[in-house]
């Protein structure tokens, strides 16, 4: 089983890398073949972002019931990229460092488990731009791909341990990403969520009778160059 999980993880990582390379190649090809501007604005836009994360885990039991852990506050910073197909449709991506986690009471005990996890993350979403005067409003829907690189966890009164190297959480995560954004051509505000679809718990996080997935709600602000 261990070898099988390692093979699946490597395969998943390769698919993420291949998809990223393909996206860069397609965007580069499209940029070379089409005019640089759409509606008087640059077809390609780069930017930076910062976000407040409200993260948790969701447990989907085999009996159909769903329970969530307590939330923890985190954050995200990164680079953003947008490519406009026309004046309405565009694809959004980027690369960011995102801090997530959760807090939960120990089963059958009085201690509390607190987990912090840092991911390198690449969201890929498609958006439809609605122009209202000086502001653009853009609902987005797509996916996110993440790999855990750092973090720690601890039970009340105990020493902290490493979240991923100690295999509390699975470092690979991916799922649905969605949000509503507003920009004036330079400043971007956003609110949205992420629903992880990959199995989140590692070998030292035993869960019976269901599956565990990451959840995150975020508020973001960005600047477009």
Regions from the PLM with identified roles:
Residues 40-45, 52-58, 82-153, 216-225:
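Gram-negative (and chloroplast) outer-membrane scaffold detector with strong preference
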Residues 94-96, 100-102, 165-167, 171-225:
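Predominantly the C-terminal beta-signal and adjacent terminal strand-loop region
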Residues 35, 126-128, 134, 157-161, ...:
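First exposed extracellular module after export/assembly in secreted or surface-exposed proteins
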Residues 140-174:
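Charged, low-complexity C-terminal accessory regions
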Residues 1-42:
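Cleavable N-terminal export/targeting peptides
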Residues 42-44, 69-75, 116-122, 135, ...:
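Residues that define the transmembrane beta-barrel architecture of outer-membrane proteins
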Residues 62-67, 107-114, 161-166, 203-209:
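Extracellular loop and loop/strand-boundary signature of outer-membrane beta-barrel proteins
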Residues 32-74:
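Short glycine/proline- and aromatic-enriched beta-strand/turn motifs that initiate or cap beta-hairpins
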């Amino acid at each position: 089983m261990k070898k099988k999980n390692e093979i699946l993880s490597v395969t998943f990582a390769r698919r993420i890398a291949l998809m990223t390379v393909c996206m860069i190649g397609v965007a580069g090809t499209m940029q070379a073949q089409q005019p640089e501007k759409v509606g008087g604005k640059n077809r390609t836009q780069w930017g930076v972002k910062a976000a407040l994360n409200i993260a948790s885990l969701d447990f989907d039991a085999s009996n159909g019931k769903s329970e969530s852990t307590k939330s923890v506050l985190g954050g995200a910073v990164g680079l953003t990229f947008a490519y406009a197909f026309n004046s309405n449709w565009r694809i959004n991506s980027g690369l960011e460092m995102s801090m997530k986690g959760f807090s939960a009471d120990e089963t059958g005990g009085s201690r509390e488990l607190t987990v912090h996890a840092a991911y390198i993350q690449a969201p890929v979403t498609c958006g439809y731009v609605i122009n209202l005067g000086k502001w653009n409003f853009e609902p987005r829907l797509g996916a996110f791909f993440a790999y855990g690189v750092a973090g720690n966890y601890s039970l009340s009164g105990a020493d902290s341990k490493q979240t991923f190297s100690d295999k509390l959480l699975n470092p690979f995560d991916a799922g649905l990403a969605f949000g509503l954004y507003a920009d004036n051509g330079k400043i971007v505000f956003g609110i949205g969520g992420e629903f992880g679809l990959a199995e989140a718990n590692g070998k030292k996080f035993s869960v019976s009778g269901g599956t565990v997935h990451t959840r995150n709600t975020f508020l973001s602000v960005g600047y477009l160059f």
